Amino acid sequence: MEKVEASMHGWAQAPYGTKAQVDANYKRMLHYGCMPDNARYVQFGVASHNLFDLCYAMLLREREGVRDQVEFEMLEGMANHQARVIRQAAEGLLLYAPVVLKEDFHSAIAYLVRRLDENTSEENFLHDLFGMTPGSRSWEVQKKRFLKACQEKDEVKYGPNRTQNRAADPIQPSHYRDAFANERDTDWSLRQNAEWINGMIAAEKEKSGEEIPLVIDGEEITTNLWGVGRDPSRHNEVSYKFAYADFDQVEHALVTADRARSSWASKSIGESAEILHRAAQELSRIRGEAIAAMVRDAGKAPTEADVEVSEAIDFCRYYAEGLDRDGMNDGVEMSPLGTICVMSPWNFPFAIPTGGVAAALMAGNAVVFKPSELAVYTAWQIVQAFWRA
């Protein structure tokens, strides 16, 4: 699961990457737990079916004088003969067993099968236990692994593998013909990222009363027709105002787009792609502001808004490379449609319109953007990022 999670979100894997690292850290933890200054505050349980580790812990607790604070734990139904010997040698053993109602007995079997599957993987001690004797090949393999872990216990890295910091990490630029890679989502398990977005949302809550104009031919236009945007969490309050377009202004926008499309369509694939890559970089730069805008404008949870920003960035980079893949131009002549109107919904106010705008622009079209009237403030963040690009 950890591998899947890391791969899906573009994060470092949270646990160690190899069994050897896990084994070395286990020895480090044994030493830490058996230190008298630590052991006196807890009842320290050593859970394992590895005889090398169990015996190592027995010797360690005797050496450190913490016998009463360190106990041993094993699973019922798995190497019971080994458990009996450990119980006698350690003068006690905590034995775990699943307890279920009779009609749920299959759940207990599933639990034990899962444990058995984990513990009998090729590198695990139980994999070799039943055919192992001192001096045998499997014994020597396990002995070598144990000694290697002991040697590396003070060298193995400990602490979080994930260090993402949205407040400090630099924005990673991308360029035309770079290999596509999904934008990394925000790792909300990290305190610094939670503090970062809390600050963004707090700053957004201080804003109110903005007036969002129409923008046609580079000119900001206000009208006598105003709509109001509301924060779903404070629905009785007007959060901001936005200008409606009348029929003449709609016509003006279409004429402007028609006039601009030939200039835009004349750009090469590489030129258009670089602009979309710059747009992706701008969207990445305003991730925090965009998340806070969606929280204010659409009632999105930060976790939901964050993946929208990632998807929007991915759209820009993906479409930037879409017309230059192998085979795309073999015997095909492509031409723009002309002017595309992108009309976006309220429930995905960031990713969907960004994808529509990016795809239309990359195909050489002019774009008229008409967002949902329930998410105009979010759309305002998007268009400004594209204009800066």
Regions found by a protein language model. Give the residues of each.
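Flexible loop/turn segments at secondary-structure boundaries
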Residues: M1-K3, L51-Y56, E62, M78-A83, ...
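Terminal low-complexity tails and localization/encapsulation signals of metabolic enzymes
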Residues: E91, K102-V255, R259-S262, S266-Q281, ...
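Extended, amphipathic, non-transmembrane alpha-helical segments
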Residues: S284-A290
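Alpha-helix capping and helix-loop boundary segments enriched in small/acidic/polar residues
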Residues: Y16-A24, G45-S48, E73-M74, A245-D248, ...
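Generic beta-strand/beta-sheet core signal
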Residues: Q43-H49, E73-L75, Y96-P98, N119, ...
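Rossmann-like NAD(P) dinucleotide-binding subdomain of oxidoreductase/dehydrogenase enzymes
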Residues: V295, C316, E321-A389
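Positively charged, amphipathic and often flexible ligand-engagement surfaces
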Residues: M1-A179
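Secondary-structure transition/capping motifs at alpha-helix termini
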Residues: P36-R40, L60-V70, A89, A265, ...
